[in-house]
Amino acid sequence: MFLNGQGGQRPPMVAFPPLNVRGSISSGFNALGRSRNNSDAMDIYTITDRGPAAERDPAAGRWHANGSPSINSTSSKNPDRYPCYQENGRTYHGYRKGIYMLPCDEQEQDRLDIFHKLFTVARVSDGLIYAPHPTNGRFLDLGCGTGIWAIDVANKYPEAFVVGVDLAPIQPPNHPRNCDFYAPFDFESLWALGEDSWDLIHMQMGSGSVASWPNLYRRIYSHLRPGAWFEQVEIDFEPRCDDRSLEGLAIRQWYQLLKQATEETMRPVAHNSRETIRNLQEAGFTEIDHQMVGLPLNPWHEDEHERRVARWYNLAISESIETMSLAPFSRVFGWPIERIKQIAADVKSEAFNKEIHTYNILHIYQARKPLAN
């Protein structure tokens, strides 16, 4: 399902019929340092074309691209000062404790990598970047998670310099020499990353982790070179169905509760495309392009590509419902873990019901910082 958005045309992007893939992915990662070498059920390396580096280049972290200073020249924080903590049977990072609603353990890292794979499959023409970009530029990934996007880009463009920043230090040590990570890093705080110095800034799945999008967009704008681009990828998790009402269904109730809980914590998970475009414009961006891709939760298409995309989304959403609910529902509503697990099970049952043609929408934005006069 390709939904035309604002801006130029893209090749049709289809993301559809989720097959009932309910198994979890387990791998040989520890909680905060994934080796990415072994897997009990599925090798996480099969999610992308990248492979592990044979060994870490000793120059990594000091490599200069385009004459720019290394990311490690900025002030760094010791992750050991912010120990992880357990909540509802999951592990959460201690930096800015309580602000971010998602865990950082092995299960969560696998979930993030699954979504990355979903995006690369759904984005037909180029799974990593739509926005114009040099092959030897400086790329910044905000909220990089496991670093999988940054590593893929660094491998694709060996002359580029790619930096990922995140609250949690969960990135692998065996990344390419032209890629580096800075964590813990709060992109809502002041940056020491060089204004007017980045050729592309990328962000995906930021909804639920940002208190002020206008402030963030202004900061992104100030750090891009004139003429450079920002690209953002988000999922609107509001359930939609074109052939029946979702009133009274658990999946609709779940989303409304999640929306309410995250709004009360000042970091709403709800995504509004009109508001996003307006905020980008007010920050100074021009040439804003917006694409939308339907992500159905049921297998009602015959096309093989659509079925492939759907398999990944089915797996991604099945791994997400409980994970996204745990902290918001327990912290905001005071729900016990048993009640959270029950509503998650009810939602999964409906999401996998082939008689209910529910879908979400994937939004992809590109926005340009104008050239200097």
Swiss-Prot record:
SUPFAM superfamilies: S-adenosyl-L-methionine-dependent methyltransferases (SSF53335)
UniProt function note: Methyltransferase that performs automethylation. No other methyl-accepting substrate has been identified yet. Component of the velvet transcription factor complex that acts as a global regulator for secondary metabolite gene expression. Positively controls expression of 20% to 40% of major classes of secondary metabolite biosynthesis genes such as nonribosomal peptide synthetases, polyketide synthases, and P450 monooxygenases. Controls the expression of the gliotoxin gene cluster.
Assembly description: Component of the heterotrimeric velvet complex composed of laeA, veA and velB; VeA acting as a bridging protein between laeA and velB.
Biased composition (Polar residues): 67-77
Organism field: Aspergillus fumigatus (strain ATCC MYA-4609 / CBS 101355 / FGSC A1100 / Af293)
GO MF entry, a single one: methyltransferase activity
Subcellular location: Nucleus
Catalytic activity: L-methionyl-[protein] + S-adenosyl-L-methionine = S-methyl-L-methionyl-[protein] + S-adenosyl-L-homocysteine
EC number(s) on file: 2.1.1.-
Family label: Belongs to the methyltransferase superfamily. LaeA methyltransferase family.
GO cellular component, one term: nucleus
Gene Ontology biological process terms, A to Z: methylation; positive regulation of gliotoxin biosynthetic process; regulation of secondary metabolic process; regulation of secondary metabolite biosynthetic process; secondary metabolite biosynthetic process; sporulation resulting in formation of a cellular spore; symbiont-mediated perturbation of host phagocytosis
Keyword Nucleus listed: yes
Principal location listed in the UniProt entry: nucleus
Effect of deleting the gene: Reduces the production of the immunotoxin gliotoxin. Reduces the production of endocrocin. Affects transcription of numerous secondary metabolite biosynthesis genes. Decreases spore formation and germination. Reduces virulence in a murine pulmonary infection model through increased phagocytosis by host macrophages.
Induction: Expression is induces in response to antifungal activity produced by Lactobacillus plantarum.
Chain spans, region Disordered: 55-81
Descriptive protein name: Secondary metabolism regulator laeA
Keyword tags: Methyltransferase, Nucleus, S-adenosyl-L-methionine, Sporulation, Transcription, Transcription regulation, Transferase, Virulence
